[in-house]
């Protein structure tokens, strides 16, 4: 049987000093024989997805202690991508993922914790904690803060979200009064932004990976049902500790649960629900931490056979996360994938012996359990609040319409090809990604003229100054993990293209990335990035570029000989932006850039550079 890791600091005469300090935290004699369970919280008043988490760590702690464990809470940082967007603050967003992963490792290993409850929610926090969990490989369970309710206003016929506020603000025909109304209505409650953006996508994927409870990704932050997820997480982590430390059951460890097949399940879910392209970046990073040989080629392979079964904002206006929950949540999508013969159902989860068992219990189309049906009727109250579990509104009926509803069957899929795709070509030899769920079918094949911008800032200025015309392909480069540094999100350029009426008339290609709120022909993660010698750095104004989503290709229509000549010329100049950027790159950002890999590797640290240290 494996010993408790905490035994290192709680047992033996020589640990009298450590025990004295543990006692100062409130531990008693009997506690030194119990598992010490770390609660990694991410409360902050900066982020609406985390503003309500302050007391939830202690809610979990009390449940852990009732079940026989010792709970010790700590906090990580959390960056709000929406607030950090559009200025140099976005340089810090992706690097914060690595800081969060390191912070969890530091706290858990420094104090020899036996297990972890990860209380996450927004864009980089769930991925960072996931990376740490797979790095540490001790019992873990994820429970997120939950999605925000969609906004409501009499000025719109559909639910609102953050992207609506951004688009209307850039629309010169909209009145100041309308902009103000959208601003006040778009984000009405605590929780992660209400569409299938990065935060909600990642929280849904933790269900598919088997590391979170059913409902984790879709139960509203404001709904009282979400409290039960936190309480159950506290009890479950103690049970996982008993199984591992008491019964030597390694099947409960994160690397046993989130193995290669589980990553395939998560990616198939992602493709089926049209998740954020950021999820590709984060799944690749997490797989590397778990030593899982899952890469961009696997994602490309899966994207060709998984249909799109769910469509949510920003890919469609009339559905948000509250509607996904009403339609049965993630386990209904997983159930559809299983019936289609795609899902690996023999895998364990933190709550069930197998995914097959979990689907049978939680898929509303398979179970008659009234408690499960009631759970998925949890809906929005439409009352602005920053308080968790503050309402108990329920829909009168479930959305079990698999022909025309939010979640579809294979036979009635939104499209037979899924919502994410990987493209390859001479402009991105190692690949780039596009959220096809947000691309109008009329522009799945698009040939356009390159319009070069050496930064997101210059692209925004160019778009707002009407320098971009129909038929252009906006190229934003030197915004990758190393070149930015930090791989900024390009939500403002894509939103402004939409507000200028160019959403279906232009494309955008970048070695940066996109917010989960992005839609349109927006292609990111071009690898290698420009700063690493990628061909995106060789494109010139006026070049023709051909994008062919059905054939998964993207090519600069320039001869190999011409590209070779340009490469020789660029090698002499150095792979740097052609224009000076007024950008303060601090020591912290330089340290990140020094080790950063391109997006096809998940933008993780280049471990080869650390070998021998």
UniProtKB/Swiss-Prot annotation:
Pathway: Amino-acid biosynthesis; L-isoleucine biosynthesis; L-isoleucine from 2-oxobutanoate: step 3/4; Amino-acid biosynthesis; L-valine biosynthesis; L-valine from pyruvate: step 3/4. It is an enzyme of class 4 (lyase). The modification N6-carboxylysine is found at residue 124. Keywords: 2Fe-2S, Amino-acid biosynthesis, Branched-chain amino acid biosynthesis, Iron, Iron-sulfur, Lyase, Magnesium, Metal-binding. GO terms for molecular function: 2 iron, 2 sulfur cluster binding; dihydroxy-acid dehydratase activity; magnesium ion binding. [2Fe-2S] cluster binds at residues 122, 193. PROSITE patterns: ILVD_EDD_1, ILVD_EDD_2. The keyword Magnesium applies. The active site is at 515 (proton acceptor). This is Dihydroxy-acid dehydratase. GO terms for cellular component: cytosol. Its cofactor is [2Fe-2S] cluster; Mg(2+). Homodimer. One of its GO terms (biological process) is isoleucine biosynthetic process. Functions in the biosynthesis of branched-chain amino acids. Catalyzes the dehydration of (2R,3R)-2,3-dihydroxy-3-methylpentanoate (2,3-dihydroxy-3-methylvalerate) into 2-oxo-3-methylpentanoate (2-oxo-3-methylvalerate) and of (2R)-2,3-dihydroxy-3-methylbutanoate (2,3-dihydroxyisovalerate) into 2-oxo-3-methylbutanoate (2-oxoisovalerate), the penultimate precursor to L-isoleucine and L-valine, respectively. The lineage of its organism: Bacteria, Pseudomonadati, Pseudomonadota, Gammaproteobacteria, Pseudomonadales. It comes from Pseudomonas putida (strain ATCC 700007 / DSM 6899 / JCM 31910 / BCRC 17059 / LMG 24140 / F1). Binds 1 [2Fe-2S] cluster per subunit. This cluster acts as a Lewis acid cofactor. Belongs to the IlvD/Edd family. The keyword Transport does not apply.
């Amino acid at each position: 049987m494996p010993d408790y890791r905490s035994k290192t600091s709680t047992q033996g005469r020589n640990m009298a000093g450590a025990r004295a300090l543990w006692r100062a935290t409130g531990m008693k004699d009997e506690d030194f024989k119990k598992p010490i369970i770390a609660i990694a919280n991410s409360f902050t008043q900066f982020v609406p997805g985390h503003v309500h988490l302050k007391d939830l760590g202690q809610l979990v702690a009390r449940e852990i202690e009732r079940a026989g464990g010792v709970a010790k809470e700590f906090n990580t940082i959390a960056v709000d991508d929406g607030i950090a967007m559009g200025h140099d603050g976005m340089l810090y967003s992706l690097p914060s993922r690595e800081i969060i992963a390191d912070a969890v490792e530091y706290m858990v290993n420094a104090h020899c914790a036996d297990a972890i409850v990860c209380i996450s929610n927004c864009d980089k926090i769930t991925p960072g904690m996931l990376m740490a969990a797979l790095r540490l490989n001790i019992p873990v369970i994820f429970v997120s803060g939950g999605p925000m309710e969609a906004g409501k206003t009499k000025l719109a016929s559909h639910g609102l979200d953050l992207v609506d506020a951004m688009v209307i603000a850039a629309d010169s025909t909209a009145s100041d009064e309308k902009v103000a109304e959208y601003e006040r209505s778009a984000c009405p409650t605590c929780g992660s932004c209400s569409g299938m953006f990065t935060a909600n996508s990642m929280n849904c994927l933790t269900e598919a990976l088997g590391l979170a409870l059913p409902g984790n990704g879709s139960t509203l932050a404001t709904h009282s049902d979400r409290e039960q997820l936190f309480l159950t997480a506290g009890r479950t982590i103690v049970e996982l500790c008993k199984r591992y430390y008491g019964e030597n059951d390694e099947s409960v460890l994160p690397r046993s649960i989130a193995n290669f097949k589980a990553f395939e399940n998560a990616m198939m879910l992602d493709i089926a629900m049209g998740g954020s392209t950021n999820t590709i970046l984060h799944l690749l990073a997490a797989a590397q931490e778990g030593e899982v040989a899952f890469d961009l080629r696997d994602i490309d392979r899966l994207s060709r056979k998984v249909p799109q079964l769910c469509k949510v904002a920003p890919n469609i206006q009339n559905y948000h996360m509250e509607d996904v929950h009403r339609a049965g949540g993630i386990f209904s999508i997983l159930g559809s994938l299983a019936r289609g013969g795609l899902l690996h159902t023999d895998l364990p989860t933190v709550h069930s012996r197998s995914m097959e068992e979990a689907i049978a219990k939680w898929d509303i189309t398979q179970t008659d359990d009234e408690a499960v049906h009631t759970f998925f009727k949890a809906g929005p109250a439409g009352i602005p609040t920053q308080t968790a579990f503050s309402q108990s509104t329920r829909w009168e009926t479930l959305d079990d319409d698999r022909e025309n509803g939010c979640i579809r069957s294979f036979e009635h899929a939104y499209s037979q090809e899924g919502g994410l795709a990987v493209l390859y070509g001479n402009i991105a030899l190692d690949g780039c990604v596009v959220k096809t769920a947000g691309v109008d079918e009329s522009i799945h094949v698009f040939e356009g003229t390159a319009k070069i911008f050496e930064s997101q800032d210059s692209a925004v200025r160019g778009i707002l100054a009407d320098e971009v015309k129909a038929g252009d392909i906006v190229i934003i480069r030197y915004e990758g993990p190393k070149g930015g540094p930090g791989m900024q999100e390009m939500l403002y350029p894509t939103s402004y293209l939409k507000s200028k009426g160019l959403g279906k008339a232009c494309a955008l290609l970048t070695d940066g990335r996109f917010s989960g709120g992005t839609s349109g022909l927006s292609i990111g993660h071009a690898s290698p990035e420009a700063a690493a010698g990628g061909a995106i750095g060789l494109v010139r104004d006026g070049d023709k570029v051909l994008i062919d989503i059905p054939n998964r290709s993207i090519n600069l229509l320039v001869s190999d000989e011409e590209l070779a000549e340009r490469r020789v010329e660029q090698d002499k100049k150095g792979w740097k932006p052609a224009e000076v950027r007024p950008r303060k790159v601090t020591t912290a950002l330089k340290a990140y850039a020094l080790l950063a890999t391109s997006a096809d590797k998940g933008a993780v640290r280049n471990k080869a550079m650390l070998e021998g240290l």
